């Protein structure tokens, strides 16, 4: 059992209030997931730089800043608790190579031109306060509260999962064919950091989006993803909700003017 939430703003006048609204939604889902929490915020930023969301819990900010500056040219580096948002023109292939060689204890939790992801073990109320979610602005956001069932309670095991540029996924449910699907995706070049079935679903969607649009990808998912689930998958343009055909996991969708 987990809690998933998402909000998309029609009016730019409300963008400064996005974090406050998403905070309330996450806290209200606390009883469905007390083990960990996380959220993804999409911002309407017109820049050519990539933004990399990194968890640096095993290294001090000053040490990381000094060492990473020797490896790549940084546009900006902003600290938020044990996460940082790194802005640079360097492409994901370069960043992944640098992290794998020089910073093996630093975790890349998401990247893109718009998305910022923060997630951590702990009570959702504490996670919201830790990252000061109330102060975030943006166009849309999704969040997750986790009750662990099939994998460890770790930051890497927390949602959202991001396996593609400006893409992320949160999930309530369980997949029964994630091990077979994981093996197929690894053969196609996907890399996974946890044993969580949700990360496999995120990898499936990212892999499928190479050849299909989001709507067709999700339709294919109904055939390829076996289990009971409700997903929210986020992109730079918005997000979509997918439920299995039996639909035993609840989802409430509302729209206002």
Where are these regions (language model features)?
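Conserved short alpha-helical segments that host acidic/polar catalytic motifs at enzyme active sites
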Residues: 1-257
């Amino acid at each position: 059992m987990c809690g998933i939430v998402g909000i998309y703003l029609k009016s730019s006048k409300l963008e400064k209030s996005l974090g406050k609204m998403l905070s309330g939604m996450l806290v209200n889902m606390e009883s469905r997931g007390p083990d960990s929490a996380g959220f993804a915020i999409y911002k309407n930023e017109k820049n050519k730089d990539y933004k990399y969301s990194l968890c640096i819990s095993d290294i001090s900010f000053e040490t990381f800043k000094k060492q990473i500056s020797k490896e790549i040219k940084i546009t900006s580096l902003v600290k938020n608790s044990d996460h940082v948002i790194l802005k640079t023109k360097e492409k994901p292939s370069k960043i992944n190579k640098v992290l794998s060689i020089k910073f093996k204890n630093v975790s890349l939790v998401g990247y893109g031109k718009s998305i910022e992801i923060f997630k951590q073990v702990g009570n959702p109320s504490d996670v919201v306060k830790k990252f000061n979610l109330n102060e975030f602005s943006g166009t849309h956001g999704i969040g997750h509260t986790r009750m662990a069932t099939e994998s460890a309670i770790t930051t890497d095991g927390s949602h959202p999962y991001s396996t593609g540029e400006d893409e992320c996924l949160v999930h309530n449910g369980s997949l029964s064919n994630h091990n077979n699907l994981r093996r197929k995706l690894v053969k196609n070049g996907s890399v996974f950091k946890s044993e969580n079935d949700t990360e496999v679903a995120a990898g499936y969607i990212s892999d499928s989006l190479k050849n299909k649009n989001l709507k067709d990808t999700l339709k294919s998912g109904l055939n390829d993803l076996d289990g009971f689930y409700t997903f929210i998958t986020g992109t730079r343009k918005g997000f979509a909700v997918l439920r299995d055909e039996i639909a035993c996991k609840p989802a409430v969708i509302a729209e206002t003017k």
